[in-house]
Amino acid sequence: MFVGHYGVSFAARRLEYSPPLWLLFIAVQLLDVLWAPFVLLGIEKVRIVPGITASNPLDLYYMPYTHSLVAALLWSAVALALYRSQGGGPGARAAALLVGLAVLSHWVLDFVVHRPDLPLYDDTAKVGLGLWNRPALAFALEAAVLFGGMALYLGGQSGPRLPMILFGAVMLLIQAYVFFGPPPVSAQAAAVTALVAYVVFAAVAAWLERGHRIPAPRAA
């Protein structure tokens, strides 16, 4: 899954004591944010195999440090602890828990779309429901989760809604290109492109949220 992950960010931002939207954007993609440099460094492995699924050409054959269930739980705990260490406040624990759950949500949503390439631990017992092999349904799920979360978010703010909706539309167009466009030229190019997208999306989210009046996070 790609842009659907951001639906979790939008929904979580609606909750009391939630961290800023840009931070939630990073949290829901943290496993992939780590995956990209791990691939570039040769720690995790991926290759381009057109047709391996009907909508994603990436053969993610070795990624135990970012996308095993055990690793996802550990990275969630690390993110929770790091956010909690930044200070106290009446909502600090709740905000830290949201960050941790946002990180873990990545694995849960990936489980739905991936073929069985997500290990439960180390590089063994790989699982995945394989919705990527049904591109129309996979794309519909991405759109539904993204805009469902955004609807919750926009329902709790009084700023301009159109810019955020347009942002979501652009993200969905990028998702369509990922699904139905040509495959990446290399595994390294895929990793770099993904990492740039995560940073740019988080930056845009931070910029757009400045115009929204929503309950301010009370966590430190």
Task: Annotate the PLM regions.
Residues 1-220:
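N-terminal membrane-targeting hydrophobic helices
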